[in-house]
A protein has these predicted regions:
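Extracellular glycan-modifying ectodomains
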Residues: 1-397
C-alpha cells in the first residue's frame, strides 16, 4: 500500500506534465499557423491574442482533448487501477464500467422491464407467433447469456444487477404465448461450464469457443424439435484447430478505461480442419470460399487498440441483413435469425453444422419487419435470439 501511495503522485505529475507539454506545443503551433497564414498574418501580437482568446473560450481545450483523448483514457485507467477502483463511472450511467473480482470488465442492468413494455412485447410476440403458425413456420426464443449471468458475488457489493431477472421476464412472455424457449444460461449451469471462459475479458461479447458451443446446443434443438438433420459432429472440438492471435483485442468496456486498467484480450479463432464452402452475402457485399475466406475478415486486426474493431473479424461485424449459404449443406432447411451483435461469433459456427441457408437480421440497423423476411425467404424456423435491444425489434407492421 505504501508503494502505491508513493507512486500515485508520480503518475499524477506525469499526467500533468504530459498535458502541459501537449498544450504548449499545440499553442505554439497554432500561433505560428495564425501568424503565417491566418487572419492575423504577419502580426505576432494579434496572433497571440487570438490564440489566448481561443483558449479562454474553451475551443482550444476541446481540440486538445480530442487530439489526446486516447492518452487521457489510458492514463486515467492506469490511475484507477492503482487506486483499486472497481467501478468507473461514465456521464451516461449505462456506460459505467465494472471490474469483476476475476478481473473481467462488464456493465450491468439497472432496472427491470416495466409492465407497459412487457405488455407490448407480449402483444407483438402473440401476433407474430400466430402468423408463423398459420404459415407452418417454427418459432423458438434462444436466451443469450450475459457476462453477469454468472456468479453475482463477482460484482462489487454496491452494485445491484437486474440482468438475469429481466431475462426471466422476457422468457415468461414467450412461454405464456407457448413459444419454445432454449435458455442457454441453464445449459451452462447443467454442463458446469465456466461462464467467464465464454466471454472476452474487456468486452461484453462472447468468443469463438462460445460460438461453437452455442451452435451445437441450438442445432440439437433444431434436430429434436423441428425435424432438421444437421450433422453436429462437424462442431466437435477435435474437428477444429486454434488460430491464435495474442493481444489483438481491446473490447468496448476496455476502450472506456484503456488497455492498462484490465489488460487486452487474445483473439483466438476456431477454424474447421475439414473442407468448407460458403457464399456469404453481407449487406450489399458477396464473398465466397472456405469458412475462413468467406466468414472471417482479418482486415479488422489493423489500427491501434482504440481504432481497432477486432470483434468485427466475425462476419465483418454488424449488419442489417445477411445470408450464409452452405454449398456443402447436410440439411435442406433454412432459418431466419433475429439477432444483435452477439450473433457475429455464433452464426459462422451454426453455418458449419449444415443448414442450407441462414438468414439473419439485426433490428437495431434494419427497419424492415421480421415478417417481411419470412414472406420473402420462407424459412423453416425463425430463431429469435437476443439479450438486449428488445425495443428495436419489429416483428410485424
Amino acid at each position: 500500500m505504501k508503494k502505491k501511495i508513493k507512486i500515485l503522485p508520480l503518475v499524477f505529475l506525469l499526467f500533468l506534465f504530459t498535458h502541459f507539454v501537449s498544450a504548449g506545443i499545440s499553442f505554439g503551433k497554432n500561433v505560428a499557423v495564425e501568424y503565417i497564414g491566418g487572419n492575423n498574418k504577419g502580426n505576432i501580437v494579434n496572433s497571440l491574442k487570438y490564440e489566448i482568446k481561443q483558449i479562454l473560450t474553451k475551443q482550444e481545450d476541446v481540440n486538445l482533448y480530442e487530439a489526446h483523448k486516447e492518452s487521457y483514457i489510458t492514463i486515467n485507467g492506469l490511475v484507477q487501477k492503482i487506486f483499486g477502483n472497481k467501478i468507473i463511472n461514465d456521464a451516461e450511467v449505462s456506460n459505467d464500467v465494472v471490474k469483476l473480482k476475476n478481473g473481467q470488465l462488464t456493465g450491468y442492468t439497472h432496472s427491470l422491464f416495466t409492465e407497459e413494455k412487457l405488455k407490448k412485447y407480449s402483444k407483438d410476440i402473440d401476433e407474430f407467433s400466430k402468423y408463423l403458425n398459420n404459415n407452418e413456420t417454427g418459432f423458438i426464443y434462444v436466451q443469450i447469456p450475459s457476462k453477469t449471468s454468472g456468479d453475482s458475488q463477482q460484482l462489487p457489493a454496491i452494485i445491484t444487477d437486474y440482468t438475469d431477472r429481466s431475462f426471466n421476464q422476457i422468457i415468461s412472455v414467450f412461454k405464456e404465448k407457448n413459444v419454445n424457449v432454449l435458455d442457454l444460461r441453464s445449459k451452462i449451469k447443467e454442463q458446469k461450464i465456466d461462464i467467464y471462459s465464454l466471454f472476452y475479458k474487456t468486452d461484453h461479447h462472447w468468443n469463438s469457443f462460445a460460438g461453437r458451443w452455442a451452435a451445437n446446443e441450438i442445432g440439437a434443438v433444431m434436430n429434436s424439435d423441428y425435424g432438421f438433420t444437421l450433422d453436429l459432429s462437424r462442431l466437435d472440438q477435435e474437428n477444429f484447430y486454434l488460430n491464435k492471435n495474442p493481444k489483438k483485442f481491446l473490447g468496448s468496456w476496455g476502450k472506456r478505461v484503456g488497455p492498462l486498467y484490465a489488460g487486452v484480450d487474445d483473439f483466438d479463432i476456431l477454424i474447421p480442419k475439414y473442407e468448407t464452402s460458403f457464399v456469404y452475402k453481407y449487406n450489399d457485399i458477396t464473398r465466397t470460399g472456405s469458412f475462413e475466406e468467406a466468414l472471417i475478415d482479418y482486415s479488422f486486426f489493423s489500427g491501434n487498440y482504440y481504432h481497432r474493431f477486432t470483434y468485427c473479424t466475425f462476419l465483418s461485424g454488424n449488419f442489417a441483413f445477411i445470408n450464409i449459404h452452405n454449398n456443402n449443406f447436410s440439411c435442406d432447411k433454412s432459418v431466419l435469425c433475429i439477432v444483435n451483435s452477439y450473433s457475429c461469433a455464433l452464426l459462422p459456427y451454426m453455418a458449419l453444422s449444415g443448414y442450407k441457408d441462414i438468414y439473419a437480421i439485426d433490428p437495431r440497423v434494419n427497419s424492415f419487419s421480421a415478417k417481411y423476411y419470412v414472406d420473402k425467404y420462407k424459412p423453416d424456423v425463425v430463431i429469435y435470439m437476443m439479450n438486449t435491444d428488445y425495443d428495436s425489434v419489429t416483428l410485424i407492421k
